[in-house]
Amino acid sequence: MLMQNQVTKRAVGEDTMDLKLHHINLSTNNVAGMSHFYRDILGLKTETQDLPVLEKNKGYDGDVTFVSDGQIQTHLAEKDVNVGFRTGHIVNPLERGHIANRTDDLAAFKAHLKKKGVAFSDWDETAVAGWQQIFFYDPDGNVIEVHQITS
């Protein structure tokens, strides 16, 4: 089993880059209740490492709690159906939540998506300082994030 900080190179189509599951974001109108459930019922621990620095003055200032099983983070974020409108992005990762992968080469991953004809919304560092983020949809409309650490 891979630990969170271990990364394996894997082929993404014809391309190769580091890409690993980083977190799952669940959007909620009850962050405190969700935090209680995930900590007290599922036994997840409050996460204190490798956390995003939220840019609360750039369009999203909701409450977020971070928990983890020691490998994968779960971000419990206050639902915000209008954050896409306020920030000028077509994909809203805080309406229904999303799953997030981390890469070491976001430019290569964006080129890969373009080559495959997958449209994406480039948030750059709009929401998180030091994280360049893109968001796109899978075939069923689930939101996927891929980000790269920049600092």
What residues fall within each predicted segment?
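Core segments of cupin and vicinal oxygen chelate
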Residues: 25-73
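Vicinal oxygen chelate
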Residues: 2-17, 20-30, 62-68, 86-151
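Short secondary-structure boundary/capping segments
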Residues: 16, 56-57, 65-66, 90-91, ...
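A short, acidic/glycine-rich surface segment
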Residues: 51-56, 82-87, 122
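Short, charged/polar surface micro-motifs in flexible loops or helix N-caps
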Residues: 70-74, 81-83, 106
